[in-house]
């Protein structure tokens, strides 16, 4: 569950959510993420993933704070973590390191690790000022945990790293989805279309991951942009060109995973400015 809004709207949204959810609120807060005011005003959007099942998910806590849920269905079990962050350290890289350690601790608590994770979402305030540092931290952990490196099977989760910071003031936060049961059920796509493996230019994530979710086989497509094979931005200064290239890159991933536009269940677009948002809306409305 995620809420995207201007900082000034966060408390209003928190209160509204509490009133609407009532006894459905199990104490696990959504990821409140700070975005600039866009065409829709102070509130950019709310994203909720829900599963209809016979029972309520089990609440997971870290250091006494509810931060996720476990869903169990016959033969399957899933862990979702929300808004994992750290504010005990001052430097962004130190916060990222503590954040990754917290997520790993939660996974270990239930007999899993990052090899069980098909998808992560990384929320990074002022991303351009420290993205290289973040990548070094993440890569270090993934090597330590055996996701990448000699003898590994390149098991990097699909991921989004976006320049939206958590509303609690931390430099970063993360969400993740893990498959606790069945084990070793995730496939990873490293290279597709015009995009080579992101790890070649220092970003440790897969282009997509396929795994078993409650409703069946699911493909998670990573955050995708107008990037060439070497990781450089293309169509600089041309919003329409970047948007069309991004859509082309996403479709290449879908095709590689034997999917099409008709198989897409959910998508979210992050636009840097309202000007870009206007261009995106004009292109989106014309998509077949």
Feature locations, PLM:
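N-terminal presequence-like segments and the immediate start of the first folded domain
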Residues: 1-265, 270-288
